[in-house]
Amino acid sequence: MGWEKGLAPREKLVRLGAESLTDVELLAIFLRTGLPGVHVMQLAEDLLVQFGSLYQLMTADQSAFRTAKGVGISKYTQIKAIAELSRRLFFSRLAKEDAMLNPQATGQYLQLLLSRREREVFLVLFLDNQHHVIRHQEMFVGTINSVEVHPREIVREALKANAAALILAHNHPSGKAEPSQADRAITEQIVKACLLMEIRVLDHLVIGHGEYVSFAERGWI
């Protein structure tokens, strides 16, 4: 990855804006200090190498931090607080905007919710007639490689929420987001069940590690 000694990330942020910073520089500002004999920039780089990316660092669970040198419980709680702030920021945006007009924000929000789960979780976003998100609900939790989904229960919750449309999502704990034939089959069943109640299924996102696949983008819905 590499970093140039002598750079001052805080000064760079003030002069050029936060968007000018690299992931290493952003993380270094957050960490504030390094370790004895280890510059904070080097520590930030080492952490990003260990976790793979800034996103994976932010969404890692507590057990992953036990082996991370330089990140104690205090830093862990700060990182999780930032992740939760990000999730709430995305939700507030989706509650005010048409979710289908900003699929990237929807995908990022669902990644924050599902990407690092160790079991398959099937989640539904309930939307009003303007495609603003009313709420989300984890409908079903399965094993590491499957989850049993009941379309009628999804329809029932949609009616309770007075939802006009839905966005479906589930994760693949393996990290690979490519949908299976079973994923496509259950999506078709849910679409048909919802149409009987004049509820539209707008998309189904399969969430991996740092990636997702949209059924709508592939023309499957």
Swiss-Prot record:
Cited SUPFAM superfamilies: JAB1/MPN domain, RuvA domain 2-like
InterPro entries (alphabetical): MPN, RadC_JAB, RuvA_2-like, UPF0758, UPF0758_CS, UPF0758_N, UPF0758_YicR
Motif JAMM motif per record, residues: 170-183
Record-level GO BP terms: proteolysis
Name of the protein described by the UniProt record: UPF0758 protein PC1_4100
Residues reported to bind Zn(2+): H170, H172, D183
Record keywords, A-Z: Hydrolase, Metal-binding, Metalloprotease, Protease, Zinc
Any Pfam family hit: UPF0758_N
Domain of life: Bacteria
Gene Ontology molecular functions: metal ion binding; metallopeptidase activity
Family: Belongs to the UPF0758 family. YicR subfamily.
Organism in which the protein naturally occurs: Pectobacterium carotovorum subsp. carotovorum (strain PC1)
Keyword Zinc assigned: yes
Residue ranges constituting the MPN domain according to the UniProt record: 99-221
